[in-house]
């Protein structure tokens, strides 16, 4: 029996941790990819803030699927030393939170450049981050993201061919669409490395983010295929369906919305319901809180 376990970036429902917990419980989601805590980036938490956040989550029975960090969202042409120190501090935060995985990226490319010119520096810097993470007992998970080295499928494959035995792969269909890549084609190339998915769908024509199954992310097809290859996998909802407080600091471009909601909470609920509709449509049923099996 294959199982999908649901997680979410609950800061899309609210910046307040207790309200994030409420949104997760309302939607039967048992895991969180923690990105923002009461208005503070998870990467900027003090020890005390991290301990307090963990206690609230533990008391509610919510576990971290991963630390949703911004590491690697850093210009490749800048000196790496400062960012490495920032990352090392993040490893400490991750351990306090009780997580053993960190979502990260492969560095922003200069506008108009040929990413191949920066490939060696990307690989070197990722290698240093892996050294630090391995020493701390934490696994790094690379996410494809518009504007970084690993924004398109072939460069994600490049990274995985070098580090795939140590580094996980997060597959984000909408981010591939926004980088001009068809998700199903990227999936075929990256399938053997995929650790888990970010559930975010989009329209190819304008990059607009839409609920799962409503765009061109091939999410039903991909989830059906993954369910035939493994035993279990985490699906992390990252709705981006309305402009919430945290998103303003994550993306420079203005998002186009084909679906609009009165509140972030309503958008979060809609995203959860859309994923559950997709899972139901490919034969899955909820067998316990936050777990869907087939």
Question: Model-derived features: where do they sit?
Answer:
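Active-site beta-loop-alpha junctions enriched in small/polar residues
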Residues: 9-13, 35-37, 69-72, 107-109, ...
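Glycine-rich, proline-tolerant flexible connector loops at the mouths of alpha/beta enzymes
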Residues: 33-57, 106-114, 207
């Amino acid at each position: 029996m294959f199982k999908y376990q649901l997680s979410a970036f609950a800061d899309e429902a609210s910046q307040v941790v207790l309200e994030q917990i409420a949104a997760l419980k309302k939607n039967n989601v048992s895991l969180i990819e923690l990105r923002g805590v009461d208005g503070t980036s998870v990467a900027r938490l003090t020890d005390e803030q991290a301990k307090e956040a963990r206690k609230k989550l533990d008391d509610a029975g919510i576990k971290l699927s991963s630390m949703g960090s911004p590491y690697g969202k850093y210009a490749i042409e800048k000196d790496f030393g400062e960012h490495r120190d920032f990352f090392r501090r993040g490893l400490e935060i991750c351990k306090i939170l009780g997580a053993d995985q960190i979502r990260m990226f492969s560095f922003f490319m200069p506008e108009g450049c040929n990413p191949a010119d920066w490939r060696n520096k990307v690989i070197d810097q990722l290698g240093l981050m892996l050294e630090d993470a391995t020493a701390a007992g934490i696994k790094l998970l690379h996410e494809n993201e518009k504007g970084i080295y690993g924004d398109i499928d072939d460069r994600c494959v490049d990274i995985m061919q070098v580090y795939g035995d140590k580094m996980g792969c997060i597959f984000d269909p909408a981010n591939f669409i926004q980088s001009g890549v068809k998700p199903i084609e990227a999936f075929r190339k990256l399938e053997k490395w995929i650790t888990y998915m970010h559930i975010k769908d989009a329209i190819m024509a304008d990059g607009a983010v839409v609920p799962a199954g409503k765009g061109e992310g091939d999410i039903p097809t991909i989830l059906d295929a993954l369910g035939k290859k493994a035993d279990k996998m985490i699906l992390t909802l990252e709705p981006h369906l309305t402009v919430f407080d945290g998103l303003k600091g994550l993306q420079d471009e203005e998002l186009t919305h084909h679906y609009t909601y009165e509140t972030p909470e309503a958008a979060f609920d809609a995203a959860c319901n859309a994923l559950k509709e997709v899972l139901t449509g490919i034969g899955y049923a909820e067998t316990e809180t936050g777990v869907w099996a087939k």
